[in-house]
């Protein structure tokens, strides 16, 4: 089967690699550097499984800048373009998705379009009405950055949208796509759910908002424990051994961040509109409160020091361990709060060669020099590289994992 994938981020690329084991897949991107890397068997993103598969597996995979040619020949088109949250309108920016839909429909009269990008509830219905076609369906992704291909190989569930009054072809394509994902997975007995588009859209936003809720819960627990001088580690362990709660997703941090949770929680809150709620809004608020609290704690530690020159060293801007993504990283908001107090910031981030021109922080990518200059070293996730200056480190990473 010929499949086109719009977008080579962690969603699009992981799907492209997965499906190219048994299908002809063409990935479309607008960046020549990404296209060149993929065509040379190199991953443009950090993902151990993607890197290995591109290097070692026989894949029927190519990348191109020629979108029209790729879409024209495809039987299925997967759309995995960004939908960033637009704070000005308090809604997802879906223009990239809509642009691809329009382009595909202009050159292909038979392919079913499968949207993998995260979208607002009701978006598929809106697009079907706008473009007068039922050939647009939704399949939410549940992938972690840096582990996207692994999560496709071992999925928790597969969800594809389909409506009762859809044409036989669209119904067949929805089932076919679900089967493609299931047959490519290494995990057995993966649950497959076919449901309405609005329900599938809701699953995605509510699932990520629950994860954000869990992060916020353990962060607020940790705030209480630190403020009352309780052993946060012991409290969390005592709670998490309850099977109903579980020993997962319970490690305190500076706040949830990354590409999905911040924007998905805000979008769900926007979708509520006039529907009564308090919890969803509280999750978003809790994350902001946590970052402010962390900044205050750093300032308190700094003020206790007698050194005339006080420098905060930020170890890594990445959101998670082994990530290459700085987007919506909680530490960046903490840095902004500290800078508003005229505190000198130095940053160790080996993935950067320079900071943005308006950034008043200083990039120090010699680790030993960084350690010497900093009075306090702040890190969202602890690393053994800091073991020799452990007495300088402020972190709320209790379990040494994400």
Swiss-Prot record:
The UniProt record lists the keyword Transcription regulation: no
Q: Where is the active site?
A: 260
Q: Which UniProt keywords are listed?
A: Capsule biogenesis/degradation, NAD, Oxidoreductase
GO terms for biological process, alphabetical = polysaccharide biosynthetic process; UDP-glucuronate biosynthetic process
- Known pathway: Nucleotide-sugar biosynthesis; UDP-alpha-D-glucuronate biosynthesis; UDP-alpha-D-glucuronate from UDP-alpha-D-glucose: step 1/1
Source domain of life: Bacteria
Return the EC number: 1.1.1.22
- Residues recorded as binding NAD(+), renumbered to this chain, are 2-19, 29, 34, 83, 118, 145, 259, 263, 327
The reply on keyword Oxidoreductase is yes
What reaction does this catalyse? UDP-alpha-D-glucose + 2 NAD(+) + H2O = UDP-alpha-D-glucuronate + 2 NADH + 3 H(+)
Q: Which GO terms describe its molecular function?
A: NAD binding; UDP-glucose 6-dehydrogenase activity
* Residues engaged in binding substrate: 141-145, 204, 208, 249-253, 257, 320
Which Pfam families does the record cross-reference, listed alphabetically? Answer: UDPG_MGDP_dh (PF00984), UDPG_MGDP_dh_C (PF03720), UDPG_MGDP_dh_N (PF03721)
Show the InterPro entries listed in the entry: 6-PGluconate_DH-like_C_sf, 6PGD_dom2, NAD(P)-bd_dom_sf, UDP-Glc/GDP-Man, UDP-Glc/GDP-Man_DH_C, UDP-Glc/GDP-Man_DH_C_sf, UDP-Glc/GDP-Man_DH_dimer, UDP-Glc/GDP-Man_DH_N
Q: Which NCBIfam families match?
A: NDP-sugDHase
Q: Per the similarity annotation, which family is this?
A: Belongs to the UDP-glucose/GDP-mannose dehydrogenase family.
Q: What job does this protein perform?
A: Catalyzes the formation of UDP-glucuronic acid which is required for capsular hyaluronic acid synthesis.
Return the protein name.
Answer: UDP-glucose 6-dehydrogenase
What species is given as this protein's source?
Streptococcus pyogenes serotype M3 (strain SSI-1)
- What does UniProt list as this organism's lineage? Bacteria, Bacillati, Bacillota, Bacilli, Lactobacillales
């Amino acid at each position: 089967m010929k499949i086109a994938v719009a977008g080579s981020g962690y969603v699009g690329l992981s799907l492209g690699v997965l499906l190219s084991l048994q299908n002809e897949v063409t990935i479309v991107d607008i960046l020549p550097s990404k296209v060149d890397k993929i065509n040379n068997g190199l991953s443009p993103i950090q993902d151990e499984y993607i890197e290995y598969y591109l290097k070692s597996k026989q894949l029927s995979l190519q990348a191109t800048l020629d979108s029209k040619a790729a879409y024209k020949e495809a039987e299925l088109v997967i759309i995995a373009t960004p939908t960033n949250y637009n704070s000005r309108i308090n809604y997802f920016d879906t223009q990239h998705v809509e642009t691809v839909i329009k382009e595909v429909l202009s050159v292909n009269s038979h392919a079913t379009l499968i949207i993998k990008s995260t979208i607002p509830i009701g978006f598929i219905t809106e697009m079907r009405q706008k473009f007068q076609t039922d050939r647009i369906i939704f399949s939410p992704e549940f992938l972690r950055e840096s582990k996207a291909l692994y999560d496709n190989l071992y999925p928790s569930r597969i969800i594809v949208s389909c409506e009762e009054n859809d044409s036989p072809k669209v119904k067949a394509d929805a089932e076919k796509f679900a089967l493609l994902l299931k047959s490519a997975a290494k995990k057995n007995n993966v649950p497959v759910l076919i449901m309405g588009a609005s329900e599938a859209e809701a699953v995605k936003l509510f699932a990520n908002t629950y994860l954000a809720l869990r992060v916020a819960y353990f962060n607020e627990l940790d705030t209480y424990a630190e403020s009352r001088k309780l052993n946060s580690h012991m409290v969390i362990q005592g709670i998490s051994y309850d099977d109903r709660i579980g020993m997962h997703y319970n490690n305190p941090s500076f706040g949830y961040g990354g590409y999905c949770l911040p924007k998905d929680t805000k979008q769900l809150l926007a979708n509520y509109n006039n529907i009564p709620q308090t919890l969803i809004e509280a999750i978003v608020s809790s994350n902001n409160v946590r970052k402010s609290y962390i900044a205050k704690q750093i300032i308190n530690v700094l003020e206790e020091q007698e050194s005339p020159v006080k420098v905060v060293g930020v170890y890594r801007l990445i959101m998670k361990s082994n990530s290459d993504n700085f987007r919506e990283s909680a530490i960046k908001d903490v840095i902004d709060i500290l800078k508003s107090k005229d505190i000198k910031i130095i940053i160790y981030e080996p993935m950067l060669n320079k900071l943005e021109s308006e950034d008043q922080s200083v990039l120090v990518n010699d680790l030993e020099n960084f350690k010497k200059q900093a009075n306090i070293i702040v890190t969202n996730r602890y690393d053994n590289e800091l073991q020799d200056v452990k007495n300088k480190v402020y972190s709320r990473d209790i379990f040494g994992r994400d």
